[in-house]
């Protein structure tokens, strides 16, 4: 596992668990209407997060991988077509053993865009096509602002969870798209500053994610959503997440073989097409599921999937890098 990924696993995953424990110990503190005023803090935090995302998003960095349209099409189909269909199939099969909130959680997981940081990092470790990974992970994040609520409407009915689709899209435009556009407009002035302080901005972003997880679970504990659930719930979610991860990885491998991808494109496809963004998932949940008392339960499949994709990806990436290096050395020796 590479050093950046190891550091991310070392502190962030236990921190997520710690946020859940804190919510369980004193849910009234971080619940809606509590002393932390989370309903205001989260709205401001979400808008700041997407402003920073727009500020750090460099479209110039995408040009290196922009022309590989077969890779782009395969990744986006994996993220926004194969993944949602696989998740819908899992939910239909496991429906007798899942509550409505948990079914919605898996649908929500499957509708999310790919993650940027770990997709690109793992692709680099595995000696894959990094420009292609950067392009597709970034494109996926942009498309997700629109496609995620649309998939929720089609598969699970976000209208039933919050209101109507129109109001959800309005909230997304107001709290996500507008701040991101403002951040992009400020890049000529603040872009260099953001690049110098990228590590601090990423740390702030992760702290915001932890706060959003904490507040979501506070609401769930305050409404006694967890009453009647046991540790077997975590086991079931872990199994379901593992099944989805395996299905997507094998599907991406099959597509890569079908299209005749080389090692670089194959690695980028697998890592970008099989991953889901915890950051955007938690932040968008505060917009799409603002009035959902079981938001903590809805986010649980995403949190477990996030841990799974980091751990398994961290194991696979160096092995694939070694295999690619051995193959290159063998070809060089024959030549």
Labelled PLM ranges:
Residues 1-335:
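Alpha-helical transmembrane segments of multi-pass small-molecule/ion transporters
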């Amino acid at each position: 596992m590479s050093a950046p990924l190891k550091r991310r696993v070392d502190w962030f995953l236990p921190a997520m668990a710690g946020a859940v424990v804190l919510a369980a110990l004193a849910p009234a503190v971080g619940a809606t209407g509590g002393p932390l005023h989370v309903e205001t803090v989260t709205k401001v935090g979400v808008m700041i997060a997407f402003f920073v995302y727009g500020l750090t998003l460099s479209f110039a960095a995408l040009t290196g991988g922009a022309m590989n349209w077969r890779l782009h099409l395969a990744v986006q189909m994996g993220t926004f077509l194969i993944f949602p269909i696989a998740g819908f199939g899992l939910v239909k099969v496991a429906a007798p053993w899942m509550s409505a909130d948990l079914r919605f959680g898996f649908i929500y997981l499957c509708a999310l865009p790919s993650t940027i940081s770990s997709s690109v990092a793992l692709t680099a470790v595995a000696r894959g096509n990094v420009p292609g990974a950067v392009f597709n992970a970034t494109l996926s994040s942009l498309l997700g602002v629109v496609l995620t609520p649309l998939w929720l409407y089609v598969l699970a009915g976000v209208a039933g969870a919050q209101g109507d689709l129109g109001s959800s899209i309005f909230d997304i435009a107001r709290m996500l798209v507008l701040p991101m556009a403002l951040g992009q407009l400020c890049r000529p002035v603040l872009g260099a500053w953001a690049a110098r302080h990228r590590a601090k901005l990423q740390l702030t972003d992760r702290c915001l994610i932890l706060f959003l997880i904490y507040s979501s679970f506070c609401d769930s504990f305050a409404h006694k959503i967890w009453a009647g659930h046991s540790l077997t719930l975590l086991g079931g979610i872990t199994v379901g997440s593992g099944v989805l991860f395996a299905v997507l990885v094998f599907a991406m491998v099959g597509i890569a073989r079908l299209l005749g991808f080389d090692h670089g494109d194959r690695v980028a496809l697998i890592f970008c097409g099989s991953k889901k963004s915890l950051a955007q998932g938690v932040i968008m949940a505060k917009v799409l599921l603002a009035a959902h008392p079981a938001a903590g339960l809805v986010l649980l499949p995403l949190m477990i999937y996030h841990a799974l994709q980091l751990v398994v990806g961290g194991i696979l990436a160096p092995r694939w890098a070694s295999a690619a290096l051995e193959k290159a050395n063998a070809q060089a020796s024959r030549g």
